[in-house]
Amino acid sequence: MHYPFLPHGTRRFSMGFVLVSLMLGIMLPLAACGGGPAANTDTASSGPANLTYWGWIPGTDKMVALFNKTHPGIHVTWVQTPGGQPTYDKMFTAIKANNEPDLGQIEYQLLPNFESTGALVDLAQYGAGDLKSQFVPWTWNQVVLGNAIYAIPGDTGPLGMYYRSDLFKKYNIAVPTTWAQYADAAVKLHAADPNSYISDFAPKSGGWFTGLAWQNGSHFFGIDGQSWKVNVSNPQSQQVATFWQGLLDKKLVKTETDFTTGFYHDLGTGAIATWIGAPWTASSISTNVPSGKGLWSAAPIPQWEAGQTKDGNWGGSTEVVFKSSKHPKEAAEFAKWLYTNDDAIGIYITEAGAYPAKTAALDSKVLNSPNPYYNNQNLNDVFKPASTQVDATFQWGPTMNQFYLDLGDNFSNATNGKGTLTDALSATQTSTTTFMKKQGYSVSN
């Protein structure tokens, strides 16, 4: 099953690939690719079904080795890819050549891009539907389309607030539970120490802002009959943008690129006192800011109204099977096993710092132990409830590569004094609508 409103002639041609290719100045044919033979030519009589899996998560080699040991009829070879966009570029190129691997790791936001190529196997025919009850409910909505199941959820990124508990205690600042309190804390902190800012608004971090908007009930994309709806500048996302614009105008937040040396330096010195992040953010801080041991804690994400328990998501990936596989049944078996087997998930958590989508895994011992870096706090006390509070109706668009690029450029303009963050949302809505229409998508607004 495919989106009924896909651009003509693109069943095997991703819009994400179109974008990347245009950026490189390469002209590519828009006709659908043919269904030639796949590279994998194993047959049942030649021994185990040999599968190739592309992904980037550390520890996957150990998970694959465990699967191969316990499934003698199937042999999986893991090809480690760079992660993120470089992996997707490689996959889109392989799709065009009808030479995909059997399996691939894909983040949630890219699933519509890949599904639009027609290259993904509907896993419902291989019993994937039987797994639905095992996963955090909102993740299942991310991988299904009608009766079709195009991926198996792997991990998630519900949001919480990491904060310098030493600074909050030093300056007698209460841990904020609402965004209004967060803004007040920003004022108090900066007044107490002009070199300390409540947080960092990283303009190029589109996934981070999307998670914040998601928490507030924002829906950038939707489906209206046979067409897409684009509503980036909706009231909920405008409220989030206006809030952060207020902090920017008062010079209470920084605007540096996250995940950089300078960013981690500021986390270490206290120049940045909070970071709205996901479970995986914990290891990013502890690994890159070793001097911060005992200085950081975690709390639930602030709410827009007191007493609410709403959350958004930042990060997480899935497992898909590509149609060029000569062994889709065996590939589906591996995909289902990878994110439901307790031993595999244990490796996933300890080796990659992943936060599993499987509900039962959230009760595992490794996730419910005191963390020495965070004052021996059990971080799962924050993130387990958060994982159930993510809005399950959130919908990704079919051109998320373009969307994030434009959003980042427009936010960068705003943080450099060229307009506001709400202006950036409006500009991104216009450019996204225009881009989708040029690619042949039906857009109703």
Please describe what each predicted stretch is:
Residues P58, I106-L110, T260, G277-A282, ...:
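Beta->alpha turn/N-cap motifs
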